């Protein structure tokens, strides 16, 4: 099971929180879910160079609070906060709701699986050898404190006629251990030979769920 599913979804409510927090009845649920997708797609397309890993959305009545987790907060905020204000107004126009935006800086992007996947994909698009790109990403992550990392690339690697999957890993990535803090990221490299999928798993240590921690401290 742990080998097949997204490790983030498997750990929801255990060591990981939801990326969206709101409640809606049957009538409004699908519309609000679609609105979340539009918000995320718009922010990602607007801020391609900002290194955005995660977009957290909370809703209360007619107000939407958005937290953007980024490796380059300066790009999102802009000089004097102009860029983030423009983004806020555009999102209000898109949704018809009050929007507030909070920027969260990612201190070590080398330990963020989504950013690592996007970085490897960008290198593949620049025709960097896939083994070299994977090895460099793994080396940086391990150097900065990762307990383990696994990267897979799949597609027509190096222009081969037949698509295949290649892996590179270091350390351990315990996918079946639910208390393990495992981050997962996926990105695609669009090459002249077709798309190459990049998947990244990063194990950052164990997190003791709050209930177990409280009971252990008694």
From Swiss-Prot:
Pfam families: KH_2, Ribosomal_S3_C. It comes from the Bacteria. One of its GO terms (molecular function) is rRNA binding. InterPro entries: KH_dom, KH_dom-like_a/b, KH_dom_type_2, KH_sf_prok-type, Ribosomal_S3_C_sf, Ribosomal_uS3_bac-typ, Ribosomal_uS3_C, Ribosomal_uS3_CS. It comes from Desulforudis audaxviator (strain MP104C). This is Small ribosomal subunit protein uS3. The keyword Kinase does not apply. The keyword rRNA processing does not apply.
